[in-house]
Amino acid sequence: MTAMTTEILLTNDDGIDAVGLRALADALSRDYDVTVVAPESNQSGVGGARSWWDTTVEYTETGAGYAVDGTPADCVAVADVALGLDPDAVVSGCNHGPNIGAHILGQSGTVGAAMEASFLGTPAIAVSLYDRGNLPVPPTLDNGDFAVAGEVVVDLLGRAERAAADGDLALPFGADVLNVNVPAADDETAADPTYRLTEPARGFDVIEFRPGEEGPEDENVPEGWEFNERRGEMGMELRDRFWREFLRGDVPDDPGSDRLAVVEGEVSISPLSSSRSIAGDRAGEVVNGPAEAASGASRIEQD
């Protein structure tokens, strides 16, 4: 009896023509039955947004796969409902730049698609590329740059297959989603990369821009990441100072953070839960109400 081939749904947020998607499709197709359902245009930064109500999500079958006029999360829904696919796992990527830091996970379309899959009960891997010589995003990329990313995803899927229970793939570390950041193939660490279990870093802040106000020093900051280019505008932006610090050789970060793993040229693997809850075994307990709290006789106990 021939074993069933594991079915993979492949999507991304950079669009169906993105080189990272094509590179992963090539790598995964050697071992898996791969169906590509991806946005017809770049959807970077939309997070887990979905098209709702009176919005019609159009999709077209192309030589590269199904092109969806919608978000990455829409692509997962189209695959599930409109196309009737029942993949064993969803892979989202490979993104053309890293997706690291807790605040970025909420903004990333790559991670958003993976989360959408987990809401529908399918394990998912979000994978992104980083090039330490061209942060945050390399100016040009080709298939070869994603070679290590393909190898890492195939390895993680293989582990999930070996841990399968009742035919369902089981991601490592008990995760619903793995957020994975992988070095480019020409990185000196890429020949034998270290896998590092990480948590999304939490260091970021809000920058306020005021017309005519002097911005922070922008020495050694790549084009497009300066603060001074925003002079003359009024507004706010959630901006991660990490890249500026990294480019200056100053990286204050906690051991175990996804950002520090990137600095060290490692494969960062952050296990994520789709529930986003930390109640754990205490879920369902009764918490004393306001009357008890007002009397000073009550508080939410911690173990």
Please give the residue ranges for each predicted region.
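Terminal disorder- and signal-encoded targeting elements
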Residues: 1-7, 30, 303
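Short, glycine-rich nucleotide/cofactor-binding loops
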Residues: 10-17, 104-106
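Short glycine-rich anion-binding loops that position phosphate/pyrophosphate groups of nucleotides
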Residues: 42, 71-72, 95-98, 185, ...
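A structural-propensity feature for long, helix-poor, extended segments
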Residues: 142-161
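Hydrophobic/aromatic beta-strand patches that form the interior of the parallel beta-sheet core
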Residues: 35-37, 66, 91, 123-127, ...
